[in-house]
Amino acid sequence: MGKNSRNTKSLIGVLACAAVPLTGWAQSSSLQIYGVMDLGLSSYRAEGAGSRQMLTSSGNQASRIGFRGYEALGDGMGAGFDMEAGLNADTGTGQVSNTNNQPSGATSNSSGALTFNRKSFLYLRSQSLGEIRLGRDYTPAFWNMFLYDPFRVGVGMSAHVLHGTTVTSFRASNSVGYLSPGCSGPGCKGLFFQGMIAFGENSGGPDRQNGRVYGARAGYGGKNWDAAVGLATTLNKAADDYAQYNAAASYLWQDHKFMVLVGENRTGNRIATLDNADRVRFWQLGAVWKVGAAGNIPMSFMRLTRNDASGSSSQKYAMGYVHNLSKRTALYGTYTYVDNKGSINLPVATGSLSGPIPVPGGNASGFDLGLRHSF
């Protein structure tokens, strides 16, 4: 009994000694697992194509799982990483990624394997000089489309205005990025700047520059208002490059937020599958109206025009309600109506949420009713 007691005391002593450096390490480093599960019932309709009912993922926030880590290096310096994988929460499968910012780089994901398609980067940060990022990340032009959209995802989102290629409309692989101080998160403070260059990593030939991305974003983030301009260009010989330009602003009045977004997406060559268009121009008005202590009403109106042979246009109306049951859990509902004119036939939603495709000039509508939980 005495021997066991002595052994126990020795073990406790060893663990106590070992805990000293571990405690010091824990004070300067962190590792976090985070994510969102978002599932809802959806019904989408399109003129000339019938309707579709389904269980969908990401109606209010994108379903995802991520891992991030950080180490303080001293003197205001730090290093870290962030890896985030998109989830099809309704089926338990992962989503596709892209390796070279070109259609040829789309990953095959027939098995539904997990990929860190949303972001996968390593960074070095200085409080006074800013942050350098290496890896797969959001393009500078994407942030205005996301931050100034009251819905951001689901049937209400504004990203249905894409033209040309969607490979780099949101993210780019093989990138080197810079973010000015105060701009490491989605919301930047004070005067700020973001820049990116990404590589298609082709070995040679006439298409060796394909997939190279150049992007920049600049603006100001204040207490009650902010504004920014963004641009990005993806080199592509067949389309004579793909360019995005946008500008946006928001104003917070009491607990209510108002947003405006304008932009243009263009290709150097006209695209035959888009009725020989080479340009889409759009603008959006949006708001998030606070209701009581736990609710808010997002709403938006977007209009786009396409310079095709038919002079096509589309208008999108969206309204929803989000009721927070707690800090991490919410119920939501969103309704959207899309009014297409000419040869354009935008569905009510795109991507994994895509509804039926209407006939050219046909209307589309749909709703999401769901539950979202973050961790």
Walk through the language-model features, giving the residues of each.
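Cleavable N-terminal export/targeting peptides
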Residues: M1-S30
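Outer membrane beta-barrel
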Residues: S28-S43, R52-G200, N210, G219-K223
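Transmembrane beta-strands of outer-membrane beta-barrel proteins
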Residues: L31-L39, D75, A79-M83, I132, ...
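Gram-negative outer-membrane beta-barrel proteins
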Residues: L41-A49, L87-T93, P140-N144, E201-G205, ...
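Extracellular loop and loop/strand-boundary signature of outer-membrane beta-barrel proteins
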Residues: G50-M54, A106-S108, L162-G164, S203-G204, ...
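Hydrophobic, lipid-facing positions within transmembrane beta-strands of outer-membrane proteins
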Residues: Q61-I65, R118-L122, A172-V176, Y214-A216, ...
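Detector for outer-membrane/organellar transmembrane beta-barrel domains
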Residues: G211-N324, Y335-Y337
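Outer-membrane beta-barrel "beta-signal"
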Residues: H323-L325, Y337, V359-F375
